[in-house]
């Protein structure tokens, strides 16, 4: 019964985990943050107070 021979199944399992642990995480990391964030220029906003006569 060839399905009981562990040698080919072990290689399939091993190579599938190698692909899972090496190739897939790098592809996921590249899609999480594809570009480096750029800092937006910090501008002070003009905050005028309202002088309402109460």
Swiss-Prot record:
Span-the-membrane segments of this chain are 9-29
Extract the InterPro entries matched here.
ATP8_metazoa, ATPase_protein_8
Q: Main location per UniProt?
A: mitochondrion
Q: Which UniProt keywords apply?
A: ATP synthesis, CF(0), Hydrogen ion transport, Ion transport, Membrane, Mitochondrion, Transmembrane, Transmembrane helix, Transport
Q: Which GO terms describe its biological process?
A: proton motive force-driven ATP synthesis
Pfam families from the xrefs?
Answer: ATP-synt_8 (PF00895)
GO molecular-function annotation terms? proton transmembrane transporter activity
Record's subcellular location: Mitochondrion membrane
User: Which superkingdom, per the lineage?
Assistant: Eukaryota
Its cellular-component GO annotations read: mitochondrial membrane; proton-transporting ATP synthase complex
Provide the membrane topology annotation: Single-pass membrane protein
Q: Region (Disordered) spans which residues?
A: 35-54
Q: How does it assemble?
A: Component of the ATP synthase complex composed at least of ATP5F1A/subunit alpha, ATP5F1B/subunit beta, ATP5MC1/subunit c (homooctomer), MT-ATP6/subunit a, MT-ATP8/subunit 8, ATP5ME/subunit e, ATP5MF/subunit f, ATP5MG/subunit g, ATP5MK/subunit k, ATP5MJ/subunit j, ATP5F1C/subunit gamma, ATP5F1D/subunit delta, ATP5F1E/subunit epsilon, ATP5PF/subunit F6, ATP5PB/subunit b, ATP5PD/subunit d, ATP5PO/subunit OSCP.
What biological function has been recorded for the protein in this entry?
A: Subunit 8, of the mitochondrial membrane ATP synthase complex (F(1)F(0) ATP synthase or Complex V) that produces ATP from ADP in the presence of a proton gradient across the membrane which is generated by electron transport complexes of the respiratory chain. ATP synthase complex consist of a soluble F(1) head domain - the catalytic core - and a membrane F(1) domain - the membrane proton channel. These two domains are linked by a central stalk rotating inside the F(1) region and a stationary peripheral stalk.
Q: Which family does it belong to?
A: Belongs to the ATPase protein 8 family.
Official protein name in the record? ATP synthase F(0) complex subunit 8
Give the source species.
Danio rerio (Zebrafish)
């Amino acid at each position: 019964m060839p399905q009981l021979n562990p040698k080919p199944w072990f290689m399939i399992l091993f190579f599938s985990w190698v692909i899972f642990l090496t190739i897939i995480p790098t592809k996921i990391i590249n899609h999480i943050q594809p570009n480096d964030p750029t800092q937006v220029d910090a501008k002070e906003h003009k905050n005028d107070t309202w002088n309402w006569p109460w």
